[in-house]
Amino acid sequence: VRKVLLVTGSGRSGTSSAAGTLKRLGFHVPQPEVPTDEKNPRGYYEPLWVAQFHKEWLDGLGVRTIDGRPYAGEVALADLTPEREGRLRGWLAAELAARAADDVVVVKETRAYWVYPLWQRVVADAGAALVSLTMLRHPAQVVRSRDAAYLSDWSDDLRRQREVANVAAWANALFVTERATRDNPRAFVPYPDLLADWRAAVTRACGQLGLDPGDLAAQHPVDDFLTASLNRSADTWEGLHVPDVLVDLAERTWSAAQTLVLDPADSGARTALDGLAQEYADLHGTAVAVASDETAAQVLAQKRALQERLAVKNERLDRLRRRVRELEAAAGPAAGPAEATGEAR
């Protein structure tokens, strides 16, 4: 049976390193891939079609790669149309048809967990088996990595806001991913483990997923691909402007998730994460309530700004219309067909 291996996790959690490792083990990453850039010069190992599929869909709904809203996935799935689902079905069917019966297709996409039920349904209907690998990285490291990659040109105030929002979104992403993947074979791989001893991390994960990683005893291309220097962010909260209540929740979430590394079906970890998810949802609801006046003011400011822009455009259109009328008046009556050709009536 062909397998579809979804590699996911919070953005900047090592998903590219995991997918690149799997590709070097001989598993198939659909082509073409998202091209390298200055944020990830070693490669994303992410199918371009899938990245564009999710980006086009979720960006239009305001659902971020990591989003702090507990209901963000519900927003996305409520917008799912038969046409959009049909596009994914067609792409996956073509990919699987080109692979051998025992091949593994690796789909790395850090937004897939928002619409995981769609992937479950489409993969099952294609006659394949869905398995998942979730990368784990300490929230402080994720936030520092995102700061370096995306926020270097932002003001201090905006950076502080994004730090808080990204810690919240990290926790929320883990809650959603863990809950969504409970029904399929799954593995959780800490990013430091992958870099420190990739053979041990890969052997454990592949065993949990029912995959054969091949002979790892000899020198391997992964040895040159993964280096400790890839993990450049510290796992300390020092220097980050994150409230204590969120730091405490994130640390407890991180601790509970570590249990899933050795046993992805650990019932105690599931129960703990369910409780933390509810705690987070309550905290999110409180934050929304506290910020309601600020949110309303920002919406009003945006509305006024749009109205001002529209007024400027309308004024310009009025000027252009007046100019057209002036030119038409200066040109006189339009000549009829007979006058234009000089023919007698």
Regions found by a protein language model. Give the residues of each.
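PAPS-dependent sulfotransferases, especially Golgi type II membrane carbohydrate sulfotransferases
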Residues: G207, L211-R345
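Lumenal/extracellular "mature" regions of secretory-pathway glycan-modifying transferases
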Residues: Y150-A169
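Conserved phosphate-donor/acceptor-positioning beta-strand/loop module used by diverse small-molecule
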Residues: K108-A112, A126-A148
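PAPS-dependent sulfotransferase catalytic core
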Residues: V1-L88, V312-E315, R319-R325, A329
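A structural motif corresponding to the C-terminal end of an alpha-helix
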Residues: E95-D103, V176-A187
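Short, well-ordered alpha-helical microsegments
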Residues: T15, Y113-P117, W198
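The conserved 3'-phosphoadenosine-5'-phosphosulfate
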Residues: V34-P41, T134-P139, R144, R182-R252
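Glycine-rich phosphate-binding loop used to anchor ATP phosphates in small-molecule kinases
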Residues: R84-L118
